[in-house]
Amino acid sequence: MLLEMDKIKITVDSKIGNVVTISYNLEKITIDVTPKKKKEKDVLLAQSVAVEEAKDVKVEEKNIIDIEDDDDMDVESA
């Protein structure tokens, strides 16, 4: 016989993980959750974005020019 007080509502955000088991008694509630695996497409997309960002950094580094002020070069000797 279930009483109205015995009802327990448990909500787990499915974006975080998958519920494996839910067990409870009057003293405690235990929820075992496994992390969700990323989809292979999402992982590949993240890797390609990281590679593109790395390429952008290298291009920016190549465009840096060090200018040294050498006064001896500007003076002509007669």
Swiss-Prot record:
Main subcellular location: host cell
Any single Gene Ontology cellular-component annotation: host cell cytoplasm
Keywords, sorted A to Z: Early protein, Eukaryotic host gene expression shutoff by virus, Eukaryotic host translation shutoff by virus, Host cytoplasm, Host gene expression shutoff by virus, Host-virus interaction, Inhibition of eukaryotic host translation factors by virus, Inhibition of host adaptive immune response by virus, Viral immunoevasion
Induction line: Expressed in the early phase of the viral replicative cycle.
Domain of life, per lineage: Viruses
GO biological process: symbiont-mediated suppression of host adaptive immune response; symbiont-mediated suppression of host gene expression; symbiont-mediated suppression of host translation; symbiont-mediated suppression of host translation initiation
Localization per record: Host cytoplasm
Similarity comment: Belongs to the orthopoxvirus OPG173 protein family.
Protein function: Plays a role in the inhibition of host protein synthesis. Specifically, inhibits the initiation of cap-dependent and cap-independent translation. In turn, affects the outcome of infection by decreasing recruitment of inflammatory leukocytes and reducing the memory CD8+ T-cell response.
Name of the protein this chain belongs to: Protein OPG173
Lineage, broadest ranks: Viruses, Varidnaviria, Bamfordvirae, Nucleocytoviricota, Pokkesviricetes
